[in-house]
Amino acid sequence: LPLLASVTTSSATLPGLFPPPPVSGLPPFSIIKEFDTKTATKEVAPEKPKETRLICKGCSNEEHLALEFFQDAGIKDRNALATIMGNIKQESTFRSSVCEGGSITSYYNCGRGYGLIQWTSADRYYGLGDFAKKYGGSPSSLNTQLRYLTNEVQWQRIAEKMKSPGKSINRYMDYAYSWIGWGHHGNRTRYAYDYLNKFATKTVEVS
């Protein structure tokens, strides 16, 4: 029998032993990342409570501060606020450093009716100075006098009545007399109605 011819093969000629060489260019498919279907929840801050406040159109800075102060003290009725404002205007035109007679001076140089509501009697006049020493502030300043005013026993006696809504200016004026104890009514009532006409409302956030 004839000898079988030997066949020499190399690995290069054997099919399927190695993968084909890489092909340049883009792959035939793209890898898509998994889409996050969860919806992000945006935290919404709760709306701050609001309230209606009175402002005074065409009024001075001192008048604005006083109106804010009495509203903060719990007085909300228009007529009550107008009555208080009218009385302070009659007494001092909101000049906290006015001395009886009209001169502008410090508390220590007056010695008689002084300030927003012309504190005259010894106990009320010196009470203002004592209050300033005890709690801080100048006895000639608007802020100190407003704080003193609402801490006086004369005010405390009528405070709840002034906070009670729905009364006429004349009724609130009766309460104010026992608070201030004026000797001359003057233009208090007219000033009160003037303020009533100057009042307007605004909505503010409650802090």
Give the role of each language-model region.
Residues 64-68, 72, 82-85, 147, ...:
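Solvent-exposed, polar/charged alpha-helical surfaces in well-ordered, non-transmembrane soluble domains
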Residues 1-25, 31-44, 125-207:
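Non-catalytic cell-wall polysaccharide-engagement segments
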Residues 79-95:
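Short, functionally critical alpha-helical segments immediately adjacent to catalytic or ligand/cofactor-binding
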Residues 45-65, 92-166:
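Peptidoglycan-targeting cell-wall enzymes and recognition modules
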Residues 74-76:
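Extracytoplasmic/periplasm-facing segments of secreted or lipoprotein envelope proteins
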